[in-house]
């Protein structure tokens, strides 16, 4: 009996404690969707930090990433795949696409909350609030980082706090949602910068290839040598690799342009706004259903569901994929122009090879004609040698006893061989075996 009141007080204090923690959890959950995502849970060394403050051991698959959000805040960290998967809500196979095995492939993949971008040297995961860039310190990636800094200048803490408070107070304001959709979304701005950097990088490579190609090909037409042929061979191999790179990026853009559903899936900001509107409507429905009678609750649910469906359909029908389609078409035409330049250089290389082959065929024909002429001359000389050998035998002959017949015999045999040579040569030209 002495422990009764004490136990009752203890239970009541526990209940009060649970209610207070539940209120805190509810407030934390309501403020989470509208606030920007927290920084990556990693320190400068790259390993995760636990609740006790002790750093865990660095995992073997940690790589260098850069986090850049829409407010211009930037941090370079080193983290493993699991951290990125939880942060961006992407499957593990998408991180394999960003790995070294698929370094020469080009992909733009739409996921529920992120876009996986693998374009040449740019490997990133783009969400509606931030971009996670892999290996940001590479020299080829630095122009992309600089363009991000120019496009999204860093704001001070007061501006970020005001924006966060405005989002918390009115996260579902229709005018604010319309303003977000009127300007180009954050993910499309990042995608545009990535395509711009890739096109600029490829354009420089194409210009360098053209500058190197024309003098080498002109020199080859004048002088067919082993050194010039080696230059053209290396030039053609570089051209083939560059054409394959441009073709991969162009094919990826063409694949997106051919499928409106894939382009619609890239609208991360639109999906985020629709989710916020739906959550607000459901929250309003729940609050109103508490005050209304039971027979009016079903009607209210029906009206709110129709309203949410109409808002979602209106948002998706409005400017469906026009902005993204115009963006992709611009860079698709630019890549197509680069591809045409490369094909022009390759056609010129093919024409030069044909010209060199014609020259070599002509020289080969001249050598064959010379060989045939020498063969005819050898035949005539062989006939003269045959006559000389016949009369050089040690056999009785009446011509041996005639004085001074040797000179006439030699000159007559020589003249006969010359006539034989001219007749055979004329016959070969008559049959068009030799040029005129």
From Swiss-Prot:
It holds the Pfam family CorA. This is Magnesium transporter MRS2-4. Belongs to the CorA metal ion transporter (MIT) (TC 1.A.35.5) family. InterPro entries: CorA_TM1_TM2 (IPR045863), MgTranspt_CorA/ZnTranspt_ZntB (IPR002523), MRS2-like (IPR039204). A motif (Required for magnesium transport activity) lies at residues 392-394. Has the ability to complement a mutant in yeast lacking magnesium transport capability. Gene3D superfamilies: 2.40.128.330, Magnesium transport protein CorA, transmembrane region. GO terms for cellular component: membrane. Expressed in the whole plant except roots. Its main location: membrane. One of its GO terms (molecular function) is magnesium ion transmembrane transporter activity. Residues 44-53 have a biased composition (Low complexity). It comes from the Eukaryota. It is found in: Membrane. Residues 12-21 have a biased composition (Basic residues). Keywords: Ion transport, Magnesium, Membrane, Transmembrane, Transmembrane helix, Transport. Magnesium transporter that may mediate the influx of magnesium. It is a multi-pass membrane protein.
């Amino acid at each position: 009996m002495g422990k009764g009141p004490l136990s009752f007080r203890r239970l009541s204090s526990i209940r009060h404690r649970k209610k207070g923690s539940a209120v805190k959890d509810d407030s934390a959950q309501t403020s989470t969707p509208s606030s920007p995502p927290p920084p990556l849970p990693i320190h400068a060394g790259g390993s995760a930090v636990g609740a006790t403050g002790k750093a865990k051991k660095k995992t073997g698959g940690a790589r260098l990433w850069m986090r850049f959000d829409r407010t211009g805040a930037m941090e370079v960290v080193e983290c493993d795949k699991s951290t990125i998967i939880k942060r961006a809500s992407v499957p593990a196979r998408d991180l394999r696409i960003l790995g070294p095995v698929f370094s020469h492939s080009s992909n733009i993949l739409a996921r529920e909350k992120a876009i996986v971008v693998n374009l040449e040297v740019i490997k990133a995961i783009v969400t509606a609030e931030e971009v996670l860039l892999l290996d940001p310190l590479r020299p080829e990636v630095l122009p992309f980082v600089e363009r991000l800094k120019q496009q999204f200048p860093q704001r001070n803490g007061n501006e970020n706090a005001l924006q966060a408070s405005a989002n918390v107070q009115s996260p579902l304001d229709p005018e604010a949602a319309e303003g977000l959709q009127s300007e180009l979304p954050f993910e499309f701005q990042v995608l545009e910068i990535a395509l711009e950097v890739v096109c600029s990088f490829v354009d420089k490579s194409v210009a360098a290839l053209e500058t190197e190609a024309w003098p080498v090909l002109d020199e080859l037409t004048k002088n067919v040598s082993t050194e010039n042929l080696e230059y053209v061979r290396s030039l053609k191999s570089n051209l083939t690799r560059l054409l394959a790179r441009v073709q991969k990026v162009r094919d990826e853009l063409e694949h997106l342009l051919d499928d409106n559903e894939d382009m619609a899936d890239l609208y991360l900001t639109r999906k985020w706004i629709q989710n916020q509107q739906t959550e607000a409507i459901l929250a309003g429905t729940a609050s109103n259903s508490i005050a209304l009678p039971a027979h009016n609750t079903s009607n209210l649910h029906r009206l709110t569901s129709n309203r949410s469906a109409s808002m979602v359909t209106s948002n998706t029908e409005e400017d469906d994929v026009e902005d993204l389609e115009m963006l992709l078409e611009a860079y698709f035409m630019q890549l197509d122009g680069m591809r045409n330049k490369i094909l022009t250089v390759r056609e010129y290389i093919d024409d030069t090879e044909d010209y060199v082959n014609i020259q070599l065929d002509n020289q080969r024909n001249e050598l064959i004609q010379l060989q045939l002429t020498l063969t005819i001359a050898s035949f005539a000389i062989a006939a003269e040698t045959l006559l000389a050998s016949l009369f050089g035998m040690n056999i009785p002959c009446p011509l041996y006893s005639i004085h001074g017949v040797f000179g006439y015999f030699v000159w007559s045999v020589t003249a006969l061989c010359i006539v034989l040579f001219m007749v055979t040569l004329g016959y070969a030209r008559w049959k068009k075996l030799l040029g005129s």
